[in-house]
Design a protein with these regions (language model features):
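Residues forming the flavin
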Residues: 1-307
Length: 307
């Protein structure tokens, strides 16, 4: 959005959260020698100062239609809701020359018995509760994963002073990315036990681990729904074990995790390259590339091993 805005294009930035910025609001990665949330604030401040930019938080883009038309539902702020003269919700019809989807990806769970007990959460949710809201979801936290992102949760929880009991990774051929935490490689959770909430987990080797919170990460599925509204057909990405957008409309591009790109460095570079091409085709001036010193996030995932 910032690259396009600096080039002089009229921008509408739609985000379903009440704070713009996506997952950067709950991460601890470094950008240009500072935490990503600080970098995000500077970007948003610049966007707010530009007259050619319209920011629309609390807004869900629900439909992609012919001729670059999109449907969006905006939920007004609580202050507006308390005023009878103003609407609580607004239905928008947006006409665009081009759209860039940065809708991210949803984390997958992993199946095991009683995996719906209270206290069992997706790994990224646990991490964001800690980083964004300062909330500890449990006193003795375990992590069950088949990818590197589960270890990122362990790293952030440990940094915040949480007690990470154990990491169970389905993969057996990896070097643990985080040190000084008990871990089991090539292991699987068979069953969760508890009454009102989880109290322990049983592994396939017979070991029982006492825990009051289990963070689960089974990889990510890109949010590609809007790319399918005009006959787009997703294709399978074997490396990241997920479906990615394919056969996009001519006036649509997908960037970042929504396109199956999970490395932050590749994400920034991919965004810059695609936006430069889009702006050139639309007749806007070229903007000088901005250098980013960003923490490299390694993302490797393996399917559930066959026994």
């Amino acid at each position: 959005a910032l690259i396009a805005a600096r080039a002089g294009a009229k921008i509408i930035l739609v985000d379903e959260d009440f704070i713009l910025g996506g997952s950067f609001n709950g991460e601890n990665i470094q950008i240009n020698d500072g935490i990503c949330s600080d970098w995000l604030k500077s970007v948003l401040n610049e966007l707010k100062s530009l007259k050619n930019v319209r920011l629309m938080p609390c807004t869900t883009l629900y439909g992609s239609f012919d001729h670059g038309i999109y449907g969006a539902l905006e939920v007004k702020s609580y202050n507006s809701r308390n005023t009878l003269k103003k609407p609580r919700q607004v239905l928008w019809k947006i006409y665009s020359k081009f759209s860039v989807l940065c809708t991210g990806a949803l984390e997958r769970s992993i199946l095991f018995e009683n995996n719906d007990l209270p206290g069992i959460m997706l790994s990224k949710s646990v991490r964001h509760y800690c980083n964004r809201w300062g909330v500890i979801p449990g006193h003795n936290i375990s992590i069950y994963t088949n990818n590197d992102d589960g270890w990122e949760t362990a790293k952030d929880l440990k940094k915040a002073g949480c007690n990470v009991v154990c990491i169970i990774d389905q993969r057996s051929n990896i070097k643990p990315p985080v040190e000084n935490i008990d871990h089991i490689l090539g292991g699987n959770v068979l069953k969760a036990k508890g009454n009102l909430r989880i109290s322990s987990i049983k592994l396939d080797n017979g070991r029982v681990i006492n825990t009051d919170c289990l963070a689960v990460s089974g990889g990510y599925n890109p949010n590609l729904h809007l790319t399918c509204h005009q006959r787009g057909k997703p294709k399978w990405n074997e490396v990241n074990q997920c479906f990615v957008p394919h056969n996009l409309p001519k006036t649509m591009e997908v960037i970042g995790a929504a396109n199956g790109v999970f490395s932050y460095q590749k994400m920034f570079k991919d965004s810059e390259n695609k936006l430069t091409k889009i702006l050139k085709n639309l007749g806007y001036k070229k903007i000088a590339a901005e250098e980013f010193n960003i923490t490299n996030k390694v993302y490797k995932v393996s399917p559930f091993p066959k026994k």
